[in-house]
Amino acid sequence: MSHTDLIADIFAAFSAEGSAFPPMTLRGGDALDRDQPAPPFDVLVDTISDQYLESYPWGSGWLDAVSWRHYLPFMMEYALRHITESSDVTDALLTSLRPPDRDPPRLASLAKPQETAVLRFLDVMAYSAESASTDLAAMVLSEWWTPEAIPKDLDD
């Protein structure tokens, strides 16, 4: 499957989330990361572009589940379009897909089609010869996304 087809499938899986305004923006998460108040969503300033994602990648660590699901398809698309390059956007995205999950959960909030899209994305990032992120993506897969992953519940 080409990256173009995978990107289309990712956006289809996240179509509801991608079309709504997020409660928290990447810019807002970045502000919180710098101990500043999160600015409200601004339709002009918070338009998603490569420049926007590159400016605020680590804001993803501050996102609630709804906002996180809003940005996931855009960050996965970016990572696939720039698969041969190391970037903070890809590293922040992959880090956001690692356990432990939060309370309320982000990873466990994904619907089955979204989980499938993420798993297919991670498979490409971990095993494609052109990927600059094979090590981190493989670690993410082994920690949460594969049947042999570290148990999600320590009581397992």
What positions do the PLM features span?
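Long, low-complexity, highly charged intrinsically disordered regions
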Residues: 1-59
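Extended alpha-helical scaffolding segments
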Residues: 63, 68-156
